[in-house]
């Protein structure tokens, strides 16, 4: 039960921090007023802080064996003040506090990036040493930031294409899709390269034996889901996006908007599945034994 709760907390925290950064970043190159809502960013930052506290308590309980708050408190202090994980946690809480106090898009993007990057200290990179530790953390952080930019853009587009779409809103959607093209290409490249690097850091240049354990099975599902996401992203980029642009000229935008909505919703669902798998994978060893 504790392991399941840990995975659920990790999933919720990952989703929250990915979106704090991703939505704020998307809002910088989009004119969607929803993404400029300060209560939205504040609420997500507060949620992230609460999830971070819950995650720290759960981790400390598992490591110390204590269940009563009075007995657990010294261990919590030691965790925060004397470990790298605790330092990353404190940095995350500070960054989230900045989002609450200054929820503008630029402050939220920068602070959200710091909060999201702190999750790297909860992954497999924390077990490395020396230069290997540095490069593993760098790869993890870039992977997280690219994933956050992607997830935030997907949710933003889903929100934009939901509900009744008039001519003005359609132009905003088409403009947002156009602006996301170059960002999306950079995101896909970063996620792909750092994903391969992270596999090499964790498992090494081998496949034998890895796929026969839970870790390997989940990783295979993750790679398959990512491949389908790439297909959908290519469909959006080379077919549905241009189709939406053409619909602005001929006035027949309903079919194009619905097709884009279906594709983006499917892509978002796959992204959520991947985050759930990542939350689970972070608790497992790649060794099938």
Predicted regions and their residues:
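Polytopic transmembrane helical bundles with strong interfacial aromatic enrichment
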Residues: 1-289
